[in-house]
Amino acid sequence: MNPDNTIAVITETIPIGMQFDKVYLSTFNMWREILSNTTKTLDISSFYWSLSDEVGTNFGTIILNKIVQLPKRGVRVRVAVNKSNKPLKDVERLQMAGVEVRYIDITNILGGVLHTKFWISDNTHIYLGSANMDWRSLTQVKELGIAIFNNRNLAADLTQIFEVYWYLGVNNLPYNWKNFYPSYYNTDHPLSINVSGVPHSVFIASAPQQLCTMERTNDLTALLSCIRNASKFVYVSVMNFIPIIYSKAGNILFWPYIEDELRRAAIDRQVSVKLLISCWQRSSFIMRNFLRSIAMLKSKNINIEVKLFIVPDADPPIPYSRVNHAKYMVTDKTAYIGTSNWTGNYFTDTCGASINITPDDGLGLRQQLEDIFMRDWNSKYSYELYDTSPTKRCRLLKNMKQCTNDIYCDEIQPEKEIPEYSLE
């Protein structure tokens, strides 16, 4: 296929009730478009399934119904989903409709989970991003992803990652991946494509290292390279930023790789660093101190800033929703869109993936991602680390009812720390 025909689109979910001057194509409309045009095959990698709407719109139900109808149209549908102890009614419905499903027991294999979220349609079109197969991801959670159309080369490369998961659904981890599902492109040899007439270099990275087949770039390597290659700025929007690994025994280990690289960029190269971190009722308290630590570096010659992003609550409240779930980074050179939270375990024992895109002219998709970041950074939903929050939506900020003076005050009796893997 002619790579000049490639189309790439940034997608996002803006939770109901939030207002921005400019928004991009919705996750729901993009998924619906992909499903309407799929004619032969659809592969989906997923953390869990909960598309059947509980409140509000029926966007999740619409997507689920469209997937269920695909086998009736002769489309082969394969779903790789993280093995869970809880029954997934949506998945059971998929199986009854003829969808091939494999439960991937990453917990048993590596200790983590299958957290990757991507689609591959007709071996030609792909979607990758933060959105789960959850109705909340279409209306109640702020998400960001990318869809790339008409590129068999990139779709084939992402399929190799899917085949690794599919293999692990019925097999143990092999001694090595030498003869299994090699990558076609990586950080040293990216795929060259044209998007809107502009040459771009693209590759897909995967995590963890144990599942990286021959020539596949590890996601952490891709992320660190993105930071190292920046010469002007690094802007990060992620749900969690915690430089720690949580052990099975409940202990914690310092995991400084990403934080060190950000500090090095700001201090050694005078790169501007901005971190926009999600905050909600389930945020980890330990994250606050790490964010304060890195924010304290800001000085005359070190330009590093941290803000918290709060999605306003719904009325009535909706559990496990109303949070910025995005996982991306944009520099003056590269757009990095991933599926992993920035906590150690997501790179050491949990499955994730990222798309790394560098336009020759520095604009295009990279510029769009920068515009989205700055829109959010400057919005009324972003707060300084020592601000007072008007609501209790953010565990990491004081709120009006907790403090009556201008001095920051922590909770007198902090809530119990929330285990990392209870977060999505």
Curated annotation (Swiss-Prot):
<keyword id="KW-0946">Virion</keyword>
<dbReference type="InterPro" id="IPR050874">
    <property type="entry name" value="Diverse_PLD-related"/>
</dbReference>
<keyword id="KW-0677">Repeat</keyword>
<keyword id="KW-0540">Nuclease</keyword>
<dbReference type="GO" id="GO:0004519">
    <property type="term" value="F:endonuclease activity"/>
</dbReference>
<protein>
    <recommendedName>
        <fullName>Virion nicking-joining enzyme</fullName>
    </recommendedName>
</protein>
<dbReference type="Pfam" id="PF13918">
    <property type="entry name" value="PLDc_3"/>
</dbReference>
<dbReference type="InterPro" id="IPR001736">
    <property type="entry name" value="PLipase_D/transphosphatidylase"/>
</dbReference>
<feature type="domain" description="PLD phosphodiesterase 2">
    <location>
        <begin position="320"/>
        <end position="346"/>
    </location>
</feature>
<comment type="function">
    <text>DNA nicking enzyme that cleaves extruded cruciform DNA at its tip. Probably nicks viral hairpins.</text>
</comment>
<keyword id="KW-0378">Hydrolase</keyword>
<comment type="similarity">
    <text>Belongs to the orthopoxvirus OPG042 family.</text>
</comment>
<feature type="domain" description="PLD phosphodiesterase 1">
    <location>
        <begin position="110"/>
        <end position="137"/>
    </location>
</feature>
<dbReference type="InterPro" id="IPR032803">
    <property type="entry name" value="PLDc_3"/>
</dbReference>
<dbReference type="Pfam" id="PF00614">
    <property type="entry name" value="PLDc"/>
</dbReference>
<keyword id="KW-0255">Endonuclease</keyword>
<dbReference type="GO" id="GO:0044423">
    <property type="term" value="C:virion component"/>
</dbReference>
